[in-house]
Amino acid sequence: VPLDDDTIRLAKGPNLATVVTLMPDGQPQALPTWVDTDGEHLLVNTEPQRQRARNVARDPRITVLIQSGDNAWDWAEVRGRVVDTVGGDEARRHIDELSQRYVGADYQREIGPEGRIILVVAPDRELTPAKLGG
């Protein structure tokens, strides 16, 4: 499923996303985060030891809801799967790019020895207000 133009626009802007993964007991875990896209996938930068990373390593299903910071009714929901993780220097550069977009400066938090990873999300289904007729 190719990403909708509205989804790409929202993912390229400084809009927060809610990332939903499944805990080991099946309960959903929903957390706000920064989001990005390469035009084909959504990209979520995290630390490999975080619960969301452990969740998708076990069960790659993921839902990402992006809402415009200017208009909460401008949103896109992507249900999909994590199809790859990217680490190393690329993930480090990516978190700095995201931080520049969201706060105007390089990432300030200390990055531990585990480093950072990018969760690469392939969309299976998308929902936007336009697809609902709104």
Regions found by a protein language model. Give the residues of each.
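Amphipathic alpha-helical interface surfaces
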Residues: 7, 49-55, 78, 90-95
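Charged, gly/pro-rich active-site loop segments
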Residues: 1-2, 74-134
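Residues at secondary-structure transition points
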Residues: 2-5, 29, 47-51, 89, ...
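Alpha-helix boundary recognition
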Residues: 9-12, 57-58, 112
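Extreme N-terminal tail/first-helix region
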Residues: 1-16
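AMP-binding (ANL) adenylation modules
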Residues: 69-71
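Charge-dense, helix-prone N-terminal extensions
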Residues: 8, 38, 133-134
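Short beta-strand segments
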Residues: 14-48, 54-56, 63-66, 75-78
